[in-house]
Amino acid sequence: MKRLILFFITMLSGLFPMQVSAQSLSNNYVQIHTYLEAGNASKRMDQIQYFDDLGREEQLVLKRFAPNGQDVVSGVQYDGYGRKWRELIPVQSIYSTGSYISNLSEQAARFTGDASPYTEIGYEDSPLERVL
């Protein structure tokens, strides 16, 4: 009898799936809410850090941080050895949703009018790999 009840509960739970979302399907992220005024939940700054598959920071999005309400986004690119290679300058996004931007370097180049809107980090050719 116990097995029969357990079987029916399992079958019924399959008919009504629960919807749980912790991360997006393509990106891991951490979302931080900083409240700017005590007792006023509408006055807050939302910061979303997106990470790649190895847990390295890939993008930092400040949601609705620009004066016109758009997002401000900065990014990091890594070289073949996993070291920071380029840090993209913070640019205004065309979105205000806090979402991940897949073509951030192209959007930054369009926004600034510069072909290379980043800081490139060089390393010395030694086992110590010190930053130049």
For each feature predicted by the language model, list its residue ranges.
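Acidic, low-complexity segments
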Residues: L4, V20-L132
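Bacterial N-terminal signal peptides
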Residues: L6-L15
